[in-house]
């Protein structure tokens, strides 16, 4: 089992800029940072999370840490053993397929509605994210930024049908799928494929073709799932 990832002095947590300008509750900050590191595989499956160590690292009491861990449990990203330890879960292929089903069903409906009556400002914003992604294609030093822009692109689509909260809900429920995508995105040619798929989705939406929008989005969201057997074979230690 992987040792506690917070047990050494050089493994520190950075403080990201707070989003939205408002004050973020302490438990939400702890949850968000831990979740981001788990999704990025900086905290890998089987890693042990010790509440007292986390409280020290975040300079908080154990109460917000407990709340954050509870949310991570609800996301299926950790398992807590009473009076013992909290362990990061391995990626579960069955859960990946469930999460893919959920995300595909919802996001295909989003693009269909956008094609029928899209918000021009939201679509303009989505196009802007694609231009930024274009500058990063095949730059493996910028994979993390490319991934952030990918998430921003999809969030813009949800905002275009006035469903930004639904996008956050989908993100929270798709942690296993997100970790699979973390493994897949650095693959040769993958970022170029993602960008091309995003462009195809936008072209279909802007053409007002709901059926084509759905087909292109479904194809786009299924790429990592199709590659999952190969990814599992290459990273057996990360999967259950």
Segments from the language model and where they lie:
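Alpha-helix N-cap/helix-start motif at coil-to-helix transitions, marked by capping-box chemistry
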Residues: 25-28, 63, 97-104, 120-127, ...
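Short linear motifs at protein or domain termini
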Residues: 1-116, 121, 225, 229-240
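Short, surface-exposed helix/turn micro-motifs that flank interaction/cofactor sites
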Residues: 39, 66, 73, 158, ...
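Alpha-helix N-cap/N′ positions at the starts of helices
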Residues: 83, 106, 128, 193-196
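Conserved amphipathic alpha-helical segments that form helical-bundle/coiled-coil interaction surfaces
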Residues: 120-183, 195-204, 212-222
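C-terminal regulatory/effector modules of DNA-binding transcriptional regulators
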Residues: 1-2, 57, 186-240
